[in-house]
Design a protein with these regions (language model features):
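N-terminal metal-binding scaffold of metallo-dependent hydrolase/deaminase domains
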Residues: 1-44
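Metal-associated gating/positioning segment near the N- to mid-region
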Residues: 56-118
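Hydrophobic/aromatic beta-strand patches that form the interior of the parallel beta-sheet core
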Residues: 6, 49-51, 63, 96, ...
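A short helix->loop->beta-strand "cap" motif at the edges of active sites that frequently abuts
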Residues: 48, 92, 179-180
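Active-site metal-binding motif and surrounding structural segment of the metallo-beta-lactamase
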Residues: 40-58
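Divalent metal-coordination and catalytic microenvironments
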Residues: 9, 24, 30, 55, ...
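Histidine/acidic-residue-rich, glycine-tolerant segments that coordinate divalent metal ions
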Residues: 101-112, 117-186
Length: 186
């Protein structure tokens, strides 16, 4: 790959407090070499070609926080490879997947499978959630500590809400004790 130069872009990077018009230089290995208003036609070697973005945006990768993926169980609809190709084409570099799969993501063996498949097949970062309750039934809590130790980033029952207030209270206490993220649909 040859070095690439981009100019006249709206660059937005909240992490680095950048919100300006400028350019971007990407080296031969795909690594960003320079970014910002100092990158313009004045500092691009005359023999090099550049891409004028004419005000289009350059941003860090987008994270989709609520993705229902078909894997496992509904691969005929979508799998990690097709999901990641579609999202990557739109600038999404990371997704948080919901536990509404078949089987439901509610135990460590499914989490192991999911993380392995995501690592092997996806071209983007996959961050799985597990269900709050076993089999998404709203009656028995999943093992937050074990699931979190396996790499689950949060817990949700997807589109379902917990109707049992005692159970929800137990869930919130456990989440607090373990510093777990709870994503509840309302």
């Amino acid at each position: 790959m040859k070095k690439k130069y981009f100019i006249n872009a709206n660059i937005i990077d909240p992490h680095n407090s950048i919100d300006e018009v400028g350019g971007l230089i990407v080296d031969e290995n795909g690594i960003i070499e320079a970014v910002g208003k100092k990158v313009n036609t004045n500092n691009i070697p005359s023999r090099e070609k550049y891409i004028d973005l004419k005000g289009k945006h350059i941003i860090p990768g987008i994270v989709d926080m609520k993705v229902f993926v078909g894997e496992p169980g509904y691969e005929y609809k979508e799998n990690f490879r097709t999901l990641s190709e579609a999202w990557l084409s739109g600038g999404v570099t990371s997704v948080v997947t919901m536990p509404n799969t078949n089987p439901i993501i509610d135990n460590v063996s499914i989490v192991d499978f999911l993380k392995r498949r995501g690592r092997d097949k996806a071209k983007i970062n996959i961050y799985p959630t597990a269900s709050l309750t076993k089999n998404l039934e709203g009656t028995n809590m999943t093992e937050f500590g074990l699931l979190q130790a396996k790499g689950i980033i949060g817990f949700t029952d997807g589109y379902k809400t917990i109707q049992n207030t005692r159970l929800m209270s137990r869930i919130m206490r456990s989440a607090y004790d373990l510093n777990c993220l709870i994503m509840q649909n309302v």
